[in-house]
Swiss-Prot record:
It comes from Wolbachia sp. subsp. Brugia malayi (strain TRS). Gene3D superfamilies: 3.30.160.20, 3.30.230.10. The gene is rpsE. This is Small ribosomal subunit protein uS5. GO terms for molecular function: rRNA binding; structural constituent of ribosome. Residues 12-75 form the S5 DRBM domain. The N-terminal domain interacts with the head of the 30S subunit; the C-terminal domain interacts with the body and contacts protein S4. The interaction surface between S4 and S5 is involved in control of translational fidelity.
Length: 170
């Protein structure tokens, strides 16, 4: 479910990843609420994820979208369509492998990972999720991988080389 929002002249794309009904058991009985996981992006390299909990689904969604916009990160893309290099990441029990792909490959990913790539604007990528299929753990692992990812400029400065030497013949 993709929803486009036009706020502050920015084109945000929201994708609802999961909706769960959760229960709090109290002395007086059970209290039900909804927990929503949302991914928000501009399809140009910025993405964020957020969770929201409330007794009503609409209010939980608003909270989740606001949390996602606050947690936005910038991901540097190669040619505006794929990742610069392959990367592995782990969060709790969720492990993922993200691989850069040739033009025309498409998004080869399942479940929650696909939603992150769609709102991020990645066109060609291969991703594999192992061990856990919990959407929250998988998405957090993807964001951890994005945090560990280096742009060619960062790699070149670490190695003391020019960017053209690092990028080479791709």
């Amino acid at each position: 479910m993709t929803i486009k929002n036009f706020q502050n002249n920015n084109d945000w794309s929201e994708l609802l990843v999961s909706v769960r009904r959760v229960t709090t058991v109290t002395k007086g009985g059970r209290r039900f609420s909804f927990s929503i996981l949302v991914v928000v992006g501009d399809e140009k390299g910025r993405v964020g994820c957020g969770m929201g909990k409330h007794a009503e689904v609409a209010e939980a969604r608003i909270k989740a979208v606001n949390a996602a916009k606050k947690s936005m990160i910038r991901v540097y893309l190669r040619e505006g369509r794929t990742l610069h290099h392959d990367i592995k990441a782990k969060f709790c029990s969720g492990e993922i492998v993200l691989r850069a792909a040739r033009a025309g490959t498409g998004i080869i990913a399942g479940g929650a990972i696909r939603s992150v790539f769609e709102v991020l604007g990645i066109k060609d990528v291969v991703a594999k999720s192992t061990r856990s299929n919990n959407p929250h753990n998988v998405i957090c692992a993807v964001f951890k991988a994005f945090d560990n990812m280096l742009s060619p400029r960062q790699v070149a400065s670490k190695r003391g080389k020019k960017i053209s030497e690092v990028v080479g013949n791709r």
